[in-house]
Amino acid sequence: TYDMQSPCVSVRSGWVAVGDYNGNLIYDISQDGTSKQIDTNLPVKSLSVAANGVVAAILEDGDVTWINVYNPTGEKAVGIKTTMQKSGYPVSVSLSDNGKLMMVAYLKAESGSMKSIVSFYNFDEVGQNYTDTMVSSYEYSDTVIPLAEFTGTHTAYSVGNNQFMLYEGNEIPKNIFQNFMQEEVQDVRSSGNYVAFIFN
């Protein structure tokens, strides 16, 4: 049993990652019941698990926010340093099914208005040729994107307060679809290649 006040939970195939919001521990649990405890040493703000047990977490560290990636043994494999001034504040993180790609939605203030940035990271060979393994990035002015999520190994979506985007790519994901919405989205659900919206 796990005693948590405000749990963050991510489920993918046969894996579940769970950690207390602002807590320092993440439990990476496989379908057969084995569990690995990950000590982040920093408060957890959000997390995501891949279908192979790889875990990504957004961690608060004062003026710096870290996005760390841990392998199923609990060891840190990647650490990405972000600041509000340079990259913006990461509000959502998601791993592809195979754990090789990661998408992050950032919120950034610029010239008195807010914009969102959706960035993709490639932890495979292709990503080694890019700074911080960031292989593609897309900006959306006057938009707040609280949700960015992979739906497989190479397909993903993001939802903002006024628009919806689709992305695709095995190595360098591209924004293949963008649609502005007139109604306010109340909830979003995804399954495989399908995304469903509930409007107010």
Regions found by a protein language model. Give the residues of each.
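Post-signal peptide N-terminal segment of secreted/secretory-pathway proteins
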Residues: 1-42
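A short beta-strand motif characteristic of beta-propeller blades
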Residues: 1, 32-39, 76-83, 128-139, ...
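Intrinsically disordered, low-complexity segments enriched in Gly and acidic/Ser/Thr residues
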Residues: 160-200
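Residue-level marker for isolated small/hydroxyl-bearing positions within beta-strands
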Residues: 19, 57-60, 104-105, 157-159, ...
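Repeated scaffold domains used in trafficking and secretory/extracellular systems
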Residues: 2-13, 42-51, 86-95, 137-151, ...
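Hydrophobic beta-strand positions that form the internal "hydrophobic ladder"
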Residues: 16, 54-56, 99-102, 155-156, ...
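Structural motif
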Residues: 24-28, 63-69, 110-122, 161-168, ...
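Short loop/turn segments immediately following beta-strands, especially the blade-tip
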Residues: 122-128
